[in-house]
Amino acid sequence: MATLSFRNVKKTYAGNVPVIHGSDMDVADGEFIVIVGPSGCGKSTLMRMVAGLETVTEGEILIDDKVVNTLEPAERDIAMVFQNYALYPHMSVFDNMAYGLKIRRLPKDEIRKRVEAAAQILELGKLLDRRPRALSGGQRQRVAMGRAIVREPKVFLFDEPLSNLDAKLRVAMRLEILKLHRRLNTTSLYVTHDQVEAMTLAHRMVVMYQGVPEQIGTPMEVFEKPASTFVAGFIGSPPMNLLEVAVGGDGIVHTSDGIALDISPLAVPQQVRGRKVVMGLRPEHMLLNAQGLAAEIEMIETLGSEQLVHGRCGKHMVVVRCSTRQFSETPARVGDTLTIGPDGRHPLHWFEADTGRRVEGL
């Protein structure tokens, strides 16, 4: 196990194209960090620099307080699990898992001991003689993880390891990775674009945006107090509703196109009064037929136990997430107009109109 640190890490490609603009972060011994963000945000580049597959343009990466910028990947004592399993098709499961150890010339008895121990953890004991073509997608990914485990590295790196699996298998493998970390307690860095993976696996999340860590915190910290409109719109499914509003000195709120919101002034903090800001409301923290604003229903998504009601309020689209039982009590159809608003039990979110950052103190 080990600590992992980033000190003003930057990456620029040929042609002076910046990808990582300066990352500072400390990963504690045994911590599971998930880097999440949209395509092109720099999350995989950051991981590849840790692995030694990309050079660091500026700054330092430290493993156990040792700068590793110039070390070869094999010298960093890390193990990486990729999106593609990258198994040797002509080798058995045992030989795939043992290959890296054979290259390092470990004794045969030690190799067998490590492979069999990893196979027991991953429930691969009965599959060690099979070739990859005889395995399911989930089994192949477990073999790839086993190949990393047997190395007994200081740091595990996971680069979107579940992206090629179907939805049901992804859920199962998330649980496998969670149990694996609890058992091994190895420092881990996990990259994904899937916020569900990030929320369920992470001790702390790093939300990346345009090459910069936009917010670092526990999953609930990021969900409950997003640092910016980007984070608010990225974390959460459906994402947070964001309305451009003008707040009067008396706490009365109007949308940017002049629609009055029937919200109690008591719910409007002093820091935003007399200002133009962005107001955020989580879809699950809103109610149909509640005080707020009128919305014309444009679409209804039926998800079994839940309904997603999409409504238009002037130029803004708003989504309400409610139970099917609650929805059945509101005989609304596409084209109908009804009032929607906050449930009064959860605070509203407020962001600066110009920067998108969360209003200080809120």
Swiss-Prot record:
It catalyses: sn-glycerol 3-phosphate(out) + ATP + H2O = sn-glycerol 3-phosphate(in) + ADP + phosphate + H(+). Keywords: ATP-binding, Cell inner membrane, Cell membrane, Membrane, Nucleotide-binding, Sugar transport, Translocase, Transport. The keyword Transcription does not apply. Its main location: membrane. Gene3D superfamilies: 2.40.50.100, Nucleic acid-binding proteins, P-loop containing nucleotide triphosphate hydrolases. InterPro entries: AAA+_ATPase, ABC_transporter-like_ATP-bd, ABC_transporter-like_CS, ABC_transpr_MalK-like, ABC_transpr_MalK/UgpC-like, Mo/tungstate-bd_C_term_dom, NA-bd_OB-fold, OB_MalK-like. GO terms for biological process: carbohydrate transport; glycerophosphodiester transmembrane transport. PROSITE patterns: ABC_TRANSPORTER_1 (PS00211), ABC_TRANSPORTER_2 (PS50893), UGPC (PS51315). One of its GO terms (molecular function) is ABC-type glycerol-3-phosphate transporter activity. It is found in: Cell inner membrane. Residues 4-235 form the ABC transporter domain. It is a peripheral membrane protein. GO terms for cellular component: ATP-binding cassette (ABC) transporter complex, substrate-binding subunit-containing. ATP binds at G37, P38, S39, G40, C41, G42, K43, S44. The keyword Transferase does not apply. Its EC number is 7.6.2.10. Part of the ABC transporter complex UgpBAEC involved in sn-glycerol-3-phosphate (G3P) import. Responsible for energy coupling to the transport system. NCBIfam families: PRK11650.1. PANTHER family: MALTODEXTRIN IMPORT ATP-BINDING PROTEIN MSMX, SN-GLYCEROL-3-PHOSPHATE IMPORT ATP-BINDING PROTEIN UGPC. The complex is composed of two ATP-binding proteins (UgpC), two transmembrane proteins (UgpA and UgpE) and a solute-binding protein (UgpB). Belongs to the ABC transporter superfamily. sn-glycerol-3-phosphate importer (TC 3.A.1.1.3) family. This is sn-glycerol-3-phosphate import ATP-binding protein UgpC. It comes from Bordetella parapertussis (strain 12822 / ATCC BAA-587 / NCTC 13253). The lineage of its organism: Bacteria, Pseudomonadati, Pseudomonadota, Betaproteobacteria, Burkholderiales.
